[in-house]
Amino acid sequence: MKRAYAMPLTNPSFPPGPYRFFDREYIIITYRTTREALEAVVPAPLEIDEPLVKYEFIRMPDSTGFGDYTETGQVIPVKYKGQHGGYVHSMYLDDDAPIAGGRELWGFPKKLANPKIVHEGEVIVGTLHYGSVLCATGTMGYKHREADHDSVLASLAAPNFLIKIIPHVDGGPRICELVRYYLTDITLKEAWTAPAALDLRPHVMADVAKLPVLDIISAVHFKADLTLGLGEVVHDYLSDHNRLATSTTQPEKIRA
C-alpha cells in the first residue's frame, strides 16, 4: 500500500508524472457571454472580470503517460486575490487515462465524449459530439496572420483554477477544494490569428450552450510543447473557517 497512488490499486489507468506534451495544437475562440450566465457557474472566491469565455479545441498527438487524444471545453477568465487566470469550467475528451488522471489528481471537470479537430482546405474545424448529438462547432480561417508570441506565451503561463470534488463513501462531501495549477517549460512553435465562428447547442450532459455566444472577440491557433504541472490547494471549502466565511458572504456561490 505504500506505493499506491491511483486506482485500480494494482493497475492504475495512468502513471505518475511529470506529464509532457509535444506538438499540442490549440484553437481558442474567445467570445462574449452574459454576466448572469457566468455568475451562475463561477464559484467564490474567484471573481469575474469581463463576461468572456474561451472555447478551446486541443489536439494532443503525443503526451507522456496520457497518449494521443483530443479535448474541448470552456475556460472562463477570472481573478483570485488579484491574480488573473482561467477557471476551467468544462472539458470533454476521448481517452480514459487523462480523464481518470485529470479528475483524480487535479480535479479537472473531464467527461468522455468525441471532440475532433480537422483541417478542411482553408478552414480549421473543431467539433464536439456527445454520443450522436453535435454540441459544438468552431471554425477558423487557416493561418491568416501571425499572432503575437509574447501574448500567447503569457496566456499559457497564467495560472488556471479548478474545483476538485470527491465524495465520501457515505455520499457526503469528502474533498471540495479550489486548486491552482500552471503549465511549465513552454516552447511555442507557431501562433496565428484569423476570423472565427462558434455554434453551441443544448445538451443535458454537455451543457456548453449554457454560456451563450453573444459575439466573437478573437481567435488564435498555435502549437506548443509544454509540461502540465501538478497543482496546489488554495482554498478548502470544507474547512470550518472557509465554510463560515463563504456562507456568510456569498452563500449562492458555494453552490455554483
Swiss-Prot record:
The lineage of its organism: Bacteria, Pseudomonadati, Pseudomonadota, Alphaproteobacteria, Hyphomicrobiales. It is an enzyme of class 4 (lyase). It comes from Mesorhizobium japonicum (strain LMG 29417 / CECT 9101 / MAFF 303099). The active site is at residue 110. It catalyses: acetoacetate + H(+) = acetone + CO2. GO terms for molecular function: acetoacetate decarboxylase activity. Belongs to the ADC family. This is Acetoacetate decarboxylase 3. The gene is adc3. Catalyzes the conversion of acetoacetate to acetone and carbon dioxide. Gene3D superfamilies: Acetoacetate decarboxylase-like.
